[in-house]
Amino acid sequence: MVYSYSEKKRIRKDFGKRPQVLDIPYLLSIQLDSFKKFTDQDPTGERGLEAAFRSVFPIKSFSGNSELQYVSYKLGEPVFDVKECQIRGVTYSAPLRVKLRMVLYDREAAPGTVKDIKEQEVYMGDIPLMTENGTFVINGTERVIVSQLHRSPGVFFDHDRGKTHSSGKVLYNARIIPYRGSWLDFEFDPKDALFVRIDRRRKLAASIILRALDYSTQDILDLFFERVQYKIKKDSLVMALVADRLRGETASYDIKDAEGNIIVEKGRRITARHIRQLEKTNTTELEVPVEYISGKIAAQDYIDPDTGEVLVSANAEISLEDLAKLSMAGIKDIDTLYVNELDHGAYISDTLRIDSTTNRLEALVEIYRMMRPGEPPTKDAAEALFQNLFFSEERYDLSKVGRMKFNRRLGIDDDEGTGILTKEDIVAVMQKIIEIRNGNDEVDDIDHLGNRRIRSVGEMAENQFRVGLVRVERAVRERLSLGDLNELMPQDLINAKPISAAVKEFFGSSQLSQFMDQNNPLSEVTHKRRISALGPGGLTRERAGFEVRDVHPTHYGRLCPIETPEGPNIGLINSLASFARTNSYGFLETPYRKVVDGVITDQVDYLSAIEEGRYVIAQANIEVDADGRMVEEQIACRHKGESTFMRAADVQYMDVSPQQIISVAASLIPFLEHDDANRALMGANMQRQAVPTLRADKPLVGTGIERTLAVDSGVVVAAKRGGYVDYVDASRIVVKVNEDELTPGEAGIDIYNLTKYTRSNQNTCINQRPCCSVGEPVVRGDVLADGPSTDLGDLALGQNMRIAFMPWNGYNFEDSILISERVAQEDRFTTIHIQELSCIARDTKLGSEEITADIPNVGESALSKLDESGIVYIGAEVKGGDILVGKVTPKGETQLTPEEKLLRAIFGEKASDVKDSSLRVPNSVKGTIIDVQVFTRDGVEKDKRAVEIEEMHIAQAKKDLTEEFKILEEGVFGRARNLLIGAGFAEAELDALPRPQLLVQTIEDETKQTELEQLAEQHEELKADFDKKFEIKRRKITQGDDLAPGVLKIVKVYLAVKRTIQPGDKMAGRHGNKGVISKINPIEDMPYDENGNPVDIVLNPLGVPSRMNIGQVLEVHLGAAAKGIGDRITAMLEEQRELAELRGYIKKVYELGEDVQQQVDIDSFTDEEVLRLAKNLKGGIPTATPAFDGAKEKEIKDMLELAGLPTSGQLKLFDGRTGNEFERPVTVGYMYMLKLNHLVDDKMHARSTGSYSLVTQQPLGGKAQFGGQRFGEMEVWALEAYGAAYTLQEMLTVKSDDVNGRTQMYKNIVDGNHQMQPGMPESFNVLLKEIRSLGINIELDQE
């Protein structure tokens, strides 16, 4: 493999054995692609905004004399960029402008004659835009729209598993689910009649809907039944024989062939042998006894030809009298329905008997009564209602997916068709459910991923947009009918409010629009790849059963079987598997390698769950020889959702990668294959809660996916084009682009601005640091700057810690963790948290609030950190209770005492009519002010601090733009100089000229002269561009802010808090091994090895066997080896060994392992590259052990040997306090530990004096309300059991809700009198009131 310059800085040793056929696809593509389909113009009009417009327009007036047509749309440019939107708290969106055409038709002339056409561009609200990382900025906060897994539109057949009826009989049902519109259900009742429901309302006989579709009784019978024909002879009946229909029945008469030989005797069962005999003798007719026809059902009406009287009506049972009547009337042929109990039930016939309607109108009225109970039905209303239910494109749409699923399920070859239902569709569904009831077909599995599809952002936004458009449509139609159309323009007809309201509501408050989890890069990526079954149109937590939550065979390679939340949402929220993607219909597909005649090819096909069922698919870990031929005869495969063994020749596909089945978070767990699934689930979930540490540390034992994840998450800065680094500082990186990657006529400079110390959604710190230096070559995709939780472009969520598995004085009992003081001293788990505190000055009824340093009754010391505007300085170190922003609020007039009046008269007005309402630091917080922002309403004078901040921003913007301009200008001058030197000018002569003079030289060579002129033009453009950009920036900075009504000014203060690790913080490994720190032990007390190196963390060995996450033990061994190798390299560097020896050792390390795929050609590295690699490996050689394809036990032992460590992975340890050796060897090694965002600082809390609940007068609960600890029912029992009567009395009265008692107690304590007089608790009064509300009067009498 060829490594780029920056990849050679540190190479991760990979133990993977399988070749990488397919790279992991871009991780955020599910979000970006979906939204791109929504906003991009689609000429076919099948998706996105275009589809929404085409489905609603043209809008015709009621009279048909005018219509509003849609022409095209375009999205404008957003006003603010993403960062500005986050600072100002506004939505990152672009205005949508739509070109509409109003057509007026001439009433007098022929229909369709156009009288007037007006075209105009109309503003239709703002559409939120997606940032390049797949998020939306809504009101200044980053949000993610989670994809939804919902039931695909189409038709589904199911049964109730015998739960509905007490007899346990299985009742079948069919449901037609459209994309939008009414649901249509068919269901059997226990008596085997078929019923229909519309929108889950009251059920009707299914034949009613057929009558409403204009089928007569006979048509209905013909659709669902075959006929049996009888001929009436003189004294007998002859039945037309269809031999197959007799199989399995018991003969009720002797069956004879044409010659009169008895083939089946009366009472015998008819078998296949008898049927073959009948077929052999060519018997086409059978003579049956006359009684045989009794009870059979007539297939049509039989009418007396003379009188016109109906002798037997269709669907009536024929009796012997009826037979005599028919015979008398001269009717010789009788057709009956062919039914039997086994596989041709008389369901529709029974249903018709229940059905009271006889014609179409009655059926329509019946449906109308069911849909609109209580309204008087008229013929037109009933017709219109039925028509609108399933046959109107405005009200009903199956969608492309729905039609495809519908047709495939009913065996119709064509995947295309209309979005509405047809008569034939409804009949086909009824025929299919009867076929299933007859046992000739199977029901569907609704948890199969072929029956559930993904709805992503774009589709959901389009649906919301359509909802808004439909609301507008009604208003437009009315205005077209009422207004004077000659005066009106399209703009006057359209009101954009309903559209933007619908879109805003979706992005702001939909269940699927979620506050982005921004703890670390992994949590961002997994949040964007989350698939939820909840949300509008989905399931609800309470109603979801076990089956929906369970892992289904079709999840293989599509949804991760491991990563799902614990708790009530388990199985309802899933994560996309690493290689999965959605197809054009919204079904999940996963890639497979094609196998032909037992040989694996490099062709990769994506298969959906439905397609996958047809093939035989082998796993990724099968043995293959050098030619790609399968070695073994019997191969473990999957076929139709089952695991089986097949011959190599029968295999059609094979997995692309062993990591195919798991999600990104799960594939970050090394040795995942050795962990129990429950613990792996916790491991995958807890990695998302890791807080970015101060100094990121790459994992020594990784899985090789760390770099992909860090780059795809967008937190690192990756090079867009190759070149070399021209300039680096803490906030920007400049890359000079390679000549061959330039677009003609550009300066060839890429500038990357870095994000510095900004706050994330979870209050963690987002900061980017450059990891390249000037002059380094870069190629496209190289990492230039690290973000939070990344180290040289690798995801680094935690720290590598030296751990020992041993008990230590009970300090690691029950998963507690003992850590060394060194960990805290070295700031290994120190994290920075940034809090945003805001102070709002409003207009009140009594006057406006004011932000000022002049605060009544506050001493000088409290104001020491404020400037003259009353706002805290940047850099001030503050603690709980300090004032950050001074603010005073007008107080209502109070009655003054004569003394106050006198003082007022002497010293003038305005002394005490304001109260202090300043913003103070919350009690438990201590930190440094890192930024202050002031937002002032338009038209309100800016204070001094606001002007200073503004000037600073303008100066910064000017500096940035000037530097950018200088760099670009330098690029132009450099190219001009090269051009002139090429044309024969002397270098010294050119260097003596002022730079701009280079562009006005003349060259004889014409092509070069034009090139120079082009550069001069480019220079002018750069200047103009600079002025324009600066003007835009300046205007944005100085313009007033759009604040909420009644708000004059907002001051936001950003406070950085540094949190070191301390007892009570939660830590975890990557294998679901979590615990709370119990003690920070002095370094000298920690166990140490023979070389005197103490361990950092002591974990309890009992946490491993019962939890079955053995992966952590293997990780510890491999981590020890990796660190040991790093130590060997450090020693070599310190002893200044020969470079050849160092190169040889590093080469040996990278070559270790059996048939490993990774090839690192250390020999091709220059000496400088080897040295730099060695320096980066001093802390340990990073290794990768991919899931299901990782390091083997032998390889770990070989690594330990190379590191000069015992291959058992165990060391002798000594007790730090006594110096005695522990009695047995201890497993010591390196494990990657994470500090989780469950910090004791955020949870610990103690109440002093606080607020009380209004009704019960008891203290509130919870840290946010500064609440108390509830002394609950069980605690009361405990005190009762101890007989601690006085303590109990105190708890229930003065310490809780005896209002008078507690105030009295406060007074007593102040006076030094330590006595209490308990009174009546308020909650007892509440109880009395509640009893009285039940109508029982209780009064307390004093004795």
Curated annotation (Swiss-Prot):
Top-level lineage group: Bacteria
EC numbers: 2.7.7.6
InterPro entries attached to this UniProt entry: DNA-dir_RNA_pol_bsu_ext_1_sf (IPR042107), DNA-dir_RNA_pol_bsu_external_1 (IPR019462), DNA-dir_RNA_pol_su2 (IPR015712), DNA-dir_RNAP_su2_dom (IPR007120), DNA-dir_RNAP_su2_hyb_sf (IPR037033), RNA_pol_bsu_bac (IPR010243), RNA_pol_bsu_CS (IPR007121), RNA_pol_bsu_protrusion (IPR007644)
Enzyme class of the recorded protein, top EC level: transferase
This protein's record includes keyword Transcription: yes
GO molecular function: DNA binding; DNA-directed RNA polymerase activity; ribonucleoside binding
GO cellular component: DNA-directed RNA polymerase complex
Keywords, sorted A to Z: DNA-directed RNA polymerase, Nucleotidyltransferase, Transcription, Transferase
Record has Nucleotidyltransferase as a keyword: yes
Pfam families for the chain: RNA_pol_Rpb2_1, RNA_pol_Rpb2_2, RNA_pol_Rpb2_3, RNA_pol_Rpb2_45, RNA_pol_Rpb2_6, RNA_pol_Rpb2_7
Gene3D superfamilies registered for this protein in UniProt: 2.40.50.100, 2.40.50.150, 3.90.1100.10, DNA-directed RNA polymerase, beta subunit, external 1 domain, DNA-directed RNA polymerase, subunit 2, domain 6, RNA polymerase alpha subunit dimerisation domain, RNA polymerase Rpb2, domain 2
Described function: DNA-dependent RNA polymerase catalyzes the transcription of DNA into RNA using the four ribonucleoside triphosphates as substrates.
PANTHER family: DNA-DIRECTED RNA POLYMERASE I SUBUNIT 2
Known partners and oligomeric status: The RNAP catalytic core consists of 2 alpha, 1 beta, 1 beta' and 1 omega subunit. When a sigma factor is associated with the core the holoenzyme is formed, which can initiate transcription.
Family named by the database record: Belongs to the RNA polymerase beta chain family.
Entry protein name: DNA-directed RNA polymerase subunit beta
Gene name of the encoded protein: rpoB
